[in-house]
């Protein structure tokens, strides 16, 4: 299990505390308008999100990972290429839905952090969509299996993830309910279901 600032040695306890603390921080991102003045689609903004969510739990919050990581048979960007990959992602266009999702897929392949990539990157994606096209994703309408399968295939074929996410777009960009339900759903994709964001 990961070393943590909480001194926890049980992975079940760590998972519970990680969910409780970072979900509360995710709600505060919205409540305190922390993202409003950050540049959309930049790695520096993703770093800010990740650090804000996980700083009370992990020393590596907001910092580039120092190990190679994989999920199943898929290896994320090797360490030696990660910095150049992130520079390229920063420069990718983001003027329409397709470009934004292509950028999101590349950031997922980069997987820049040791832990917490999916949860922080989905917030980063919504920030980009909100800023650039005045929409966000209603994640409560995105089926877990459809999403995970589409993301697994996205490095080779991104048409599926575009389809899945386009069908869940909403213009309720300032709705607290859409945001907090979305956080709960985002955490559910990763197996975190002990707490509700609007009750923390």
Residue locations for each model-derived region?
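FIC/Doc superfamily catalytic core
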Residues: 1-200
């Amino acid at each position: 299990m990961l070393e943590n600032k909480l001194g926890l040695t049980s992975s079940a306890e760590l998972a519970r505390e990680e969910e409780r603390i970072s979900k509360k921080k995710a709600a505060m991102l919205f409540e305190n308008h922390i993202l409003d003045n950050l540049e959309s689609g930049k790695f520096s903004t993703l770093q800010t999100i990740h650090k804000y969510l996980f700083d009370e739990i992990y020393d590596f919050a907001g910092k580039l990972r120092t190990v190679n990581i994989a999920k199943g048979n898929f290896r994320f960007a090797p360490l030696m290429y990660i910095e150049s990959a992130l520079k390229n992602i920063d420069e990718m266009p983001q003027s329409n839905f397709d470009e934004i999702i292509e950028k999101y897929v590349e950031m997922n392949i980069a997987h820049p952090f040791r832990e917490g990539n999916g949860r922080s990157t989905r917030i980063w994606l919504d920030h980009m969509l909100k800023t650039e096209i005045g929409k966000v994703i209603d994640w409560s309408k995105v089926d877990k299996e459809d999403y995970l399968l589409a993301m697994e295939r996205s490095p080779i074929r991104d048409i599926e993830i575009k389809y899945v996410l386009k069908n869940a777009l909403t213009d309720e960009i300032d709705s607290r309910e859409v945001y907090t339900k979305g956080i709960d759903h985002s955490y559910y994709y990763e197996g975190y279901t002990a707490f509700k964001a609007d009750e923390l």
